[in-house]
Amino acid sequence: MTSPRVVAVIPAAGVGSRMQADRPKQYLSLNGKTILEHTIDALLNHPLIDDVIVAISQGDEYFDQLGLRQKPIRVVDGGKERADSVLNGILSLDENDWALVHDAARPCVDDADISNLLSLIGSEDVTGGILATPVRDTMKRVKPSSNIISHTEDRNGLWHALTPQLFPAMLLKRALQEGLAQGVSITDEASAMEFAGHSVAMVSGSPANIKITHPADLPLAEFYLKQKFSAQGDSAKN
């Protein structure tokens, strides 16, 4: 029996206004390459990923300056929202493909974490899963339209959702289409799958897999990338 293909989908059509930069955050430089280049390379270099699709905004003026079309990737038009971009990315996938959706602004993703997530393929208990980290801080709920604390949330069982997020492509396509048609707030792929009634697994991931959102995230991501490349270099020597 042939193993299902794993296709990575990177929604990269966002503007990233919170970064307050002169360009979308995925095109900011980090350790000599753009954030998007680091992210694409991390997925291209993983031995269990068969294909990489990148969804970019129409009229993107930065993508073609990087020579990324020379890499073995496919490029599709992004949409207005993240869910639209992901949907455009998976429309061409085959019935048995699995979609591995990963944020463009998470360049520090760990190879071992990806492998652990991909081990869910073939599981009879869940439909797919996501990388996540358990909440460590005390969580407060505030009253609506105020900064007054309503109560303290029990953090037991609370996790920070990360990416990649892995699901059978056709099930994810239907879940996204149904969610969008019904006006559901789709903040990530797992939320669409949850709405569709599927069981989604949590796979513990590295806290280094940060999403670059604010300027202060850049030096932290740079530190994590240097650690990652140093570890890869040491591994290659041994």
From Swiss-Prot:
Signal peptide: none
Residues at the site labelled Transition state stabilizer: R18, K25
Keywords: Isoprene biosynthesis, Nucleotidyltransferase, Transferase
Pathway(s) of this molecule: Isoprenoid biosynthesis; isopentenyl diphosphate biosynthesis via DXP pathway; isopentenyl diphosphate from 1-deoxy-D-xylulose 5-phosphate: step 2/6
GO molecular function, a single term: 2-C-methyl-D-erythritol 4-phosphate cytidylyltransferase activity
Catalysed transformations (reactions): 2-C-methyl-D-erythritol 4-phosphate + CTP + H(+) = 4-CDP-2-C-methyl-D-erythritol + diphosphate
Enzyme Commission number: 2.7.7.60
Domain of life: Bacteria
GO biological process: isopentenyl diphosphate biosynthetic process, methylerythritol 4-phosphate pathway
Keyword Hydrolase annotated: no
InterPro entries the record matches: IspD (IPR001228), IspD/TarI (IPR034683), IspD/TarI_cytidylyltransf_bact (IPR050088), Nucleotide-diphossugar_trans (IPR029044)
Similarity comment: family membership: Belongs to the IspD/TarI cytidylyltransferase family. IspD subfamily.
Name of the protein in its database record: 2-C-methyl-D-erythritol 4-phosphate cytidylyltransferase
The species this protein was found in: Alteromonas mediterranea (strain DSM 17117 / CIP 110805 / LMG 28347 / Deep ecotype)
